[in-house]
Amino acid sequence: MLAVLACLWLALCTAVGPLYWDFENGTIANWNWTNTAFFVLSFAIYLGLIVIMVRFAAGQRVLPRAISGRLSRAGQQHSNQALEPSQSQSVVADSNVSKRHATAASRFATLGRWITRGTNRFWKLALVFFIGWLWVPTTLLAAFGADIRSQIREFSWAWNQWTGLQQPYIGFFSFVPMDIYPTAHYMWPPDSTYLTDQHNVVLTVFYGAVAAFSRYLTGSNDAGIVALAAGQMLLAVFCCAATANRFLNRPWMGVAQSTKDKNGSSTGNVSSTTSARIAQDAAPQLAGGRARFLILAFFLCCPLAVFATISITKSPLFAFSFVWWFGIWYELTQTWKPEGKRKGLTATAPIRLPRHSFVAFVLSTAVMLISAKYAWYIIALQIVLALIADRRRWTTYVVALLIPTMLIHGGISLAISSGAIIGGDPIESRGVQLQMIARVASRNPEGISEEAKKNLSDVFNLDQMADAYSQQDADPVKSSGIQAKKVSYKWRTVMPEDMTNFNKAWFEIVKDNPVIALDALLAKCFGYFNVTDQPYVSMDYYVTSDYVQKNSTWIKSYNHNWRERITGFTRSWGKIPVIGWITHGNFYVVMTLLIGAAEVIRRRWLTLMTHIPLLLLMGVMITAPANNFERHMLPVAFVFGFVVLTYWRESLAERRIARQAQSSASTTTTLPQ
């Protein structure tokens, strides 16, 4: 059922694409037979992919019997013809072809062994990533947009305040950093402060301090920004190498096997999850050369990963720390042992995380928390799931997940409540609702009742809201921007009590204008789940943004044209049908969702527990301010190769168990009675 729902959602997002590409007149009311055809075809393709994955895992025939039989007969016919004496010339030709095939296979096998040998240690993988990415910070220096400029500005104002410069909220400083996004004035503490949690306060302080030190030494922010980009690239090297080492080399296998031997083998009837884990223990420790090549090729060649290494935009930092975190979860599930005697399964002692993995678990959790405000929701859910699935290692999850969350998230909340910093405006979380109201105000203003207008009048200027509406981005509706902007959101005068009837007004507007409201929702998020949709903001945007190419001090003069050529190439590549899909995040989002559906069908609950964060990240995409914003898809894209490898390994394990069961049953039936 869940698989069908996933396919229906993906098919809907694919089918409505042509409708919403018409920004002015697009609406689901214009649905026609073409959209129906897209919907049916997409649904069939997505469901077919899930069926193929499920049948492969079950050891069943992937291709229909008629097709596989035809291919088999064609191969047999070719072999028979090759054996006919009258076809001696053909035999010689086929022999030469076979030799060439054998030579090619031998060379590929040798290449695979060399790739494996060159990536079978953490330090080797780190060296590959470092060399492969070295050209990025050395030729492009850094990539950034408006966010880091705001963070630097915030820290500068806060630093001036800390060092004794009086900066009241009014007068000459009437338009301050908190007015840019903006944050409602009622949230500002009575004692003026200019440090906010809009861009994650820890990052704001760190980035701002580095930029301030850069200004002290060089007179501009540029050197500090370049240093931050280089540091992020090194962090990306470390995170990706650590996780690749865990997935490709599984260095804990020796420890797990010795623990298993010490405690005895499991016997009796076992669940599918446990039996697959047991069979996987017997699988080769190292991944093959092909898997290594494809995973490394993605990280070293895909624009998503390449440009993210130097993009100082919060999301890449979260994405790389998430990759690190994701790898530790894989180690935890691979070293999971059953608890107690259930279904005839003998209990074994739990395998504790090695010290370096435990420290990595704590640090990756901390970096996630300081780089994305929604990280604590993901971590909180994982704490609950982990304590249910693996409660014998509860101390690991409490120390590595719960304590960092309490310290970082709780500390920031305490600082906000004490007035030391300014929290984020609650309006930020209402992007979907705002887009619905704004689209109705733009397309059918008469459809808003007088009561709804009255309930919204103290919060929004509906005329300005209609003018500011963009189906791709909710930020203009929230009055984000510098002074020359539409004042849709009355952040200067709104009070908490003014929001009391907001939900009531929103519901009434949606009830009176259901089609327009549905348009607003779909137009805001369909691109994340439609592989044919081009990104609203791609990762190459930050490489050639005006903040880099025009408004920087000296970065703009360094390889200016080279940046334009590189981004021009990646944009051209991304526009090529099918081939260009692999350069965009929505391809990896769609495929990850399909793999997750297949895992549900195969009941791989332990693996699904570690993949739940990917589903939550897809929910973040739907509620994000903009449609098809590639930086929000980075975590899912970065771990996609590891998700595929996990599914492949567990499928082979299940097939092995099925064959063993069939062999055992066959042996039993042939024994004399």
Question: Residue spans of the language-model regions?
Answer:
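Transmembrane signal-anchor helices characteristic of membrane glycosylation enzymes that use polyprenol
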Residues: 7-18, 118-146, 156-160, 404-416
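Transmembrane-helix motifs of polytopic, lipid-linked glycan transferases
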Residues: 76, 227-284, 324
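Short acidic/glycine- and proline-prone juxtamembrane loop motifs at membrane-interface regions
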Residues: 146, 307-317
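Short hydrophobic/aromatic helix or loop-helix immediately within or flanking a transmembrane segment
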Residues: 154, 166-233, 635
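Membrane-proximal stem/loop segments at transmembrane-domain junctions that anchor or position
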Residues: 161, 166-185, 421-557
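Membrane-interface anchor segments at the N-terminal boundary of transmembrane helices
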Residues: 221-231, 235, 520-615
